[in-house]
Curated annotation (Swiss-Prot):
It comes from Corynebacterium glutamicum (strain R). Belongs to the ATPase B chain family. InterPro entries: ATP_synth_B-like_membr_sf, ATP_synth_b/b'su_bac/chlpt, ATP_synth_F0_bsu_bac, ATP_synthase_B_chain. This is ATP synthase subunit b. Keywords: ATP synthesis, Cell membrane, CF(0), Hydrogen ion transport, Ion transport, Membrane, Transmembrane, Transmembrane helix, Transport. The gene is atpF. GO terms for cellular component: plasma membrane; proton-transporting ATP synthase complex. F-type ATPases have 2 components, F(1) - the catalytic core - and F(0) - the membrane proton channel. F(1) has five subunits: alpha(3), beta(3), gamma(1), delta(1), epsilon(1). F(0) has three main subunits: a(1), b(2) and c(10-14). The alpha and beta chains form an alternating ring which encloses part of the gamma chain. F(1) is attached to F(0) by a central stalk formed by the gamma and epsilon chains, while a peripheral stalk is formed by the delta and b chains.
């Protein structure tokens, strides 16, 4: 280093005073540096850049494809959701209709059962009325027979006469019962 300083001190010109600049290299250095740079640039331009462009294009296509697939899946999911909502609304409507039909059918069954119960009640009442009328007729006939017999016995006892004649006996009984029939409706 001391030698360099000595050389600089004995030189005719200082380093900045000569035409060569420290910041700007000489022309031959620029030319010889430019040639390898151009060779490297051409190699990159012809070999590396197309491969790089191909990789970028492929990646861009994959990304676009992924986005398109995602959009398609999203559209499909949205369509499925709309379909599901439509089916759900349809099922709710159908359930409401079924409930309404069940209510109507229940009311109809209730009305039918009431009608059947009324018919059965009327039939039982009518049957009871018929039985009551039949029993009444039977009781009236038995009472007529007994009253007829009792009236004959009473008449024989009162008259002291025996009513042996069937025609006389039946005429007397019929008159007595006719008198009772005319008295009974008025006495009710």
């Amino acid at each position: 280093m001391a030698n360099s300083i000595y050389n600089l001190a004995h030189a005719d010109a200082l380093p900045l005073e000569s035409g060569n600049s420290i910041l700007f290299p000489p022309l031959y250095d620029i030319v010889w540096s430019l040639i390898p740079f151009l060779i490297i640039l051409i190699v990159f331009w012809k070999l590396v850049l197309p491969k790089f462009q191909e990789v970028l294009t492929e990646r861009e296509d994959r990304i676009k494809g992924g986005i398109q697939r995602a959009e398609a899946a999203q559209a499909e999911a949205k369509a499925a959701l709309e379909k599901y909502n439509a089916q759900l609304a349809e099922a709710r409507t159908e359930a409401a209709e079924i409930r309404e039909q069940a209510r109507e059918r229940g009311k109809q069954i209730e009305a039918e059962l009431k009608d059947k119960a009324n018919e059965e009640s009327n039939r039982i009442i009518e049957s009871g009325s018929k039985q009551l009328l039949a029993q009444r007729e039977q009781v009236v006939n038995e009472l007529r027979r007994e009253m007829g017999q009792n009236s004959i016995n009473l008449a024989e006892h009162l008259l002291g006469d025996q009513l042996s004649d069937n025609v006389k006996r039946s005429g007397t009984i019929d008159r007595f019962l006719a008198d009772l029939d005319t008295v009974a409706p008025n006495g009710k």
